Design a protein with these regions (language model features):
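Outer-membrane beta-barrel pore domains and translocons
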Residues: 2-8, 23-31, 65-71, 90, ...
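Residues on the lipid-exposed face of transmembrane beta-strands in outer-membrane beta-barrel proteins
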Residues: 3-13, 49-57, 89-95, 135-143, ...
Length: 319
């Protein structure tokens, strides 16, 4: 969210600058994974954002988002199935400070709280709670003479996923993102660079089941085109790599290192409808191929291959 500071004189004038939107979103995701055991695991997730409200006060350089989502996930493989239903509340807070000469600095905090239940052949109503925290200082720049600029942030994240008798998974990490861009008339060209490092711990009743370090890097070229009818078309293509180092894990997995190749494409279109409405549709396809190192040369080389598709739509009413 980019908010430009405007000087104010009194409370009533500040209140007059209040604006935002309300609306709903829907996302459908399919995953197909051919895993190391030679099995194919299918996963289907429907996410309905029942309500999203965005509020902005430019005079205060402050913005906030609140959303409520229902999430239904179904997993299927030979001899096993799993269903999870969840309700997610989230909030995002953004405070911007204008530095001058085209620079803005922001502090962003995101909090998501997800409460759900899992049903499978082995459990009924297994309670799950996931809490995700993200804190991001951001720095943006735009030069109107060059018609160019950049967006950047660093991030600290912490996530805790509690699956009751199935155990707890905690993730803690940092990331850095830098995205320069240049506009040529209706066209905009950019590229996003990203690096992340996370420490992951899984434990049950105090016993470590898995402890690993995950690092990911990618670059993502971005092309945008703005139509005269207030529509925007964009294409993003990601080329990335990931590495998981298992320092302390179950016996079969101890000290193994996993290497992942990541490819992802995103195509989207956003359209203003009149003065009050904005609609968007977006499609994503991701492909990931992972393999692991072996200590025994007699081990057979195997892969974990993921294909993932997402379709996302939203409609917002602006005020």
């Amino acid at each position: 969210v980019h908010i430009t500071w405007v000087g104010s004189t009194d409370w009533s004038e500040e209140q007059a600058g209040f604006n935002g939107h309300v609306g709903t979103t829907f996302e459908y995701e399919t995953k197909s994974t051919d895993n190391y055991l030679g099995k194919t695991v299918k996963e289907y997730t429907k996410t309905h954002e029942i309500f999203q409200a965005y509020f902005s006060q430019p005079n205060w350089q402050f913005a906030a988002i609140y959303g409520l989502k229902s999430i239904d996930r179904r997993q299927e493989e030979k001899g096993y199935h799993e269903n999870e239903t969840s309700l997610q509340n989230y909030i995002s807070l953004n405070k911007t400070f204008t530095i001058g000469n085209g620079f803005d600095f922001s502090l962003v905090y995101d909090l998501m709280y997800t409460d759900g239940n899992i049903d499978s052949p082995y459990v009924t109503g297994l309670h799950t709670v996931t809490v995700d925290n993200s804190f991001r200082p951001t720095l943006t720049y735009f030069n109107s003479d060059w018609n160019a600029g950049f967006y950047s942030n660093v991030e600290y994240l912490y996530s805790r996923n509690d699956k009751s008798s199935w155990g707890v998974r905690e993730e803690e990490g940092q990331s850095i993102l830098f995205q320069p861009y240049k506009r040529f008339g209706a066209w905009e060209f950019g590229i996003e660079f990203f690096y992340q490092k996370k420490h992951n711990d899984e434990f049950n009743h105090g016993k470590i089941n898995d402890r690993s370090i995950y690092t990911e890097t990618y670059y993502e070229p971005i092309i945008k085109y703005a139509f005269e009818n207030a529509g925007n078309l964009y294409l993003r293509t990601r080329f990335g790599h990931g590495k998981t180092e298992n320092a302390d894990s179950l016996q079969y997995n101890a000290n193994r290192t996993y290497f992942k190749t990541i490819r992802k494409a995103t195509l989207g279109y956003e359209q203003n409808i009149g003065d009050d409405w904005i609609a968007k549709i977006e499609y994503k396809h991701a492909w990931e191929k992972e393999h692991k190192n072996f200590y025994d040369p007699r081990d057979e080389e195997k892969y974990n291959v993921l294909n993932q598709d997402n379709i996302y739509v939203h409609a917002f009413y602006r005020f």
